[in-house]
Every structure is written in structure tokens, then in C-alpha cells.
């Protein structure tokens, strides 16, 4: 994908990963066609914040990936060299409320795009945004490409269906198809429904005196938090390879939600001390005796794997993948971005 004048198609371009990937590919000289949901105006704030909202080599088209005929028509018309399938239902919590919608949005859509590529651009490389949720509650850490797949949540199952479809089309039809097994990857462009952005925005508002505290769910859940631009660069590198494969993208370092909260508050020079257990735990600002973090079980997931941490050795070796921010740097970057946004909004 580093060759000029190549054309990449990105489903879900208005999301965090889609916008970051579009900026990366445009910077490499590629033409980019991004898809958005039909029947509504695309939300372009991320593209605009990245300075590419009106880029001359960026074109937006409406597409429902769950519509097989529409997928075939779009791929035939665009004739992309690479298809990055990033669209879909992206929140684990939402999948428990509507499992069928999650499976259709993530599983069926992948099959539709695989078939569209196979029929119309068989030499194109399809890259799927898979998920560490396909591992379920793994017995061993860290997880790699050979870790048994045992999805537990409906979201995990939907991603497992998509992941298995990519492997099947690769083996059965010789398609150039790869899956990026994405562990948690965050950035300034993360949606506010995700806990890391909820924290960065909440911390910014607390620092500005606009809020007093943040309410979270399970503080003990441990995740592997990376910086999203590193992950989309690895996906672009996957598309440039002659043959498809599966790649874990992760930092290899686990941190709890409590750790992320501590790092986010540290970015505004607030030190948290933690008291209590379970739903009674609170994070208190040292020296001010103010409760800044509370726990509410309403934010607990029905199932939450206690420890998810990835081994990205294959991606490091074959793609040159190298995480650039540690937890403190990631939290600081997100908080500083939200401080700037909140200051501008006054």
C-alpha cells in the first residue's frame, strides 16, 4: 500500500480506526474511498480533526456491509487494491442487548465483503479488524495467534465468525486476507462511550472545575492498552504483504482500569489514593479529600475476562510493529486533547 496511486477502501471510516487509517494511507499517497452508513449524514469530526475532511484523494460513499449486493456493487465500482473492514458493532456491552444485530453487523458483513473481493478484485488484500474478544477467557497469558479461540460475549462470537471467515476464504479460495487481532487501542479520537475516553474527558472537566467525579465499572479488569495510530499502521503493512495471515496487535503490558484512571489523573497533577473494595471502592484526590472516582455495578459487563494481554511477536517480526506510547503517555495524550477541546468549547 505504499505505492502511489493505489486505492484503499475503508469501511467505517468515520470511526477512530477508520479515520486514523485514512490519514495514514493518504500520507502514503494512496487514494481512499471510505464508507458510511446509508440514510444518515456521515459524522466527519474525526476526519476534520485530522485535517483530511476535504482531502482531494478522499471520497465517501454510503454502504451497508450487511447488504451483499451493495458490497459487490461498491467493490466492483471502486476496484480497490486493499479493503479494510473496520465497520461494525464495536461495543461489547451493546452485544448483550442485541446479539443478532452484532452477529449480522460483524459476521455476515465480513462474508459479504470477502465474496465481493473474490468476485471483483481477487488480487486485492482484505484486512479485517478482528478482536482479542475472540479468545474469551483465556487460560494463559499472553495470548498469541495460536491461543485457542473461545469467545464468550456475543460481540466476541460475532468477531470470531468474521475471523474464521477470513481464514476460510484464505485457505479455500486463495484470497489475500488477513485478520488484525486487536487488543485495546486508544487515542484522542476514541468515542466517549469507551472507558478510556470517558476517563480522559472526565479528568479534563474535573481539572477545569466543570465536574467533580467519574463513575466507572469493574476497576480490576486488566487490559492491554496501546496507541491506535500504531495499530492502523500495522494494518496498512498487512495489506502490503503478498500473503495473508493473522496478527496479534498489542503492547504485551497489562494494566487495570484503576491503573488507567490513576495515569489519567496524574496527567493533570492529581494523585489518587484508592480505598475500599468492589462496588465500595473510591479514588480520592490526595491532599484535597475529594472523591474523584466511584464504582457503580450498572457499568459492569455480564462477562468480563479478568486479564487480556497480547504477544505481538509475529507483528513485530513481519510488520515492524512497535508500540510508541506507554500507559502514562497514552493517558496524558488523551487528557491533553480533551483539555484543549473543552477549553475551545467555552
Could you say what each language-model-derived stretch is?
Residues 1-185, 229, 239, 334, ...:
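N-terminal Rossmann-like NAD(P)+-binding domain of SDR-like oxidoreductases, especially those catalyzing
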Residues 228, 286-322:
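Conserved C-terminal active-site "lid" loop/helix of NAD(P)H-dependent oxidoreductases
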Residues 66, 97, 105-108, 146, ...:
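Residue-level signal for the nucleotide or nucleotide-sugar donor/cofactor binding architecture
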Amino acid at each position: 500500500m505504499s505505492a502511489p496511486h493505489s486505492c484503499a477502501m475503508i469501511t467505517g471510516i468515520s470511526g477512530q480506526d477508520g479515520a486514523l487509517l485514512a490519514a495514514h494511507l493518504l500520507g502514503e499517497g494512496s487514494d481512499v474511498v471510505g464508507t458510511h452508513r446509508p440514510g444518515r449524514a456521515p459524522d466527519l469530526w474525526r476526519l476534520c480533526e485530522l485535517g483530511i475532511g476535504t482531502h482531494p484523494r478522499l471520497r465517501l460513499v454510503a454502504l451497508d456491509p450487511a447488504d451483499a449486493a451493495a458490497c459487490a456493487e461498491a467493490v466492483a465500482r471502486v476496484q480497490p487494491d486493499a479493503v479494510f473492514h473496520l465497520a461494525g458493532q464495536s461495543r461489547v456491552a451493546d452485544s448483550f442487548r442485541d446479539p443478532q444485530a452484532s452477529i449480522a453487523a460483524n459476521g455476515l458483513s465480513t462474508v459479504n465483503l470477502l465474496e465481493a473481493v473474490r468476485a471483483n478484485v481477487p488480487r486485492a488484500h482484505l484486512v479485517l479488524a478482528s478482536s482479542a474478544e475472540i479468545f474469551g477467557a483465556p487460560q494463559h497469558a499472553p495470548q498469541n495467534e495460536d491461543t485457542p479461540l473461545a469467545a464468550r460475549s456475543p460481540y466476541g462470537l460475532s468477531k470470531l465468525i468474521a475471523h474464521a471467515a477470513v481464514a476460510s476464504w484464505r485457505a479455500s479460495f486463495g484470497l489475500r486476507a488477513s485478520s488484525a487481532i486487536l487488543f485495546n487501542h486508544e487515542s484522542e479520537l476514541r468515542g466517549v462511550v469507551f472507558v478510556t475516553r470517558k476517563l480522559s474527558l472526565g479528568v479534563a472537566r474535573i481539572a477545569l472545575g466543570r465536574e467533580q467525579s467519574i463513575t466507572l465499572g469493574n476497576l480490576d479488569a486488566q487490559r492491554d492498552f496501546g496507541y491506535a495510530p500504531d495499530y492502523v499502521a500495522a494494518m496498512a503493512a498487512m495489506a502490503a504483504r503478498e500473503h495473508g495471515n493473522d496478527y496479534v496487535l498489542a503492547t504485551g503490558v497489562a494494566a487495570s482500569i484503576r491503573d488507567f484512571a490513576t495515569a489519567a489523573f496524574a496527567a493533570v497533577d492529581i494523585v489518587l489514593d484508592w480505598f475500599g473494595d468492589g462496588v465500595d471502592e473510591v479514588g480520592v484526590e490526595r491532599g484535597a479529600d475529594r472523591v474523584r472516582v466511584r464504582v457503580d455495578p450498572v457499568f459492569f459487563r455480564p462477562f468480563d475476562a479478568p486479564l487480556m494481554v497480547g504477544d505481538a511477536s509475529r507483528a513485530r517480526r513481519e510488520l515492524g510493529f512497535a508500540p510508541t506510547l506507554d500507559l502514562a503517555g497514552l493517558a496524558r495524550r488523551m487528557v491533553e486533547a480533551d483539555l484543549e477541546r473543552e477549553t475551545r468549547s467555552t
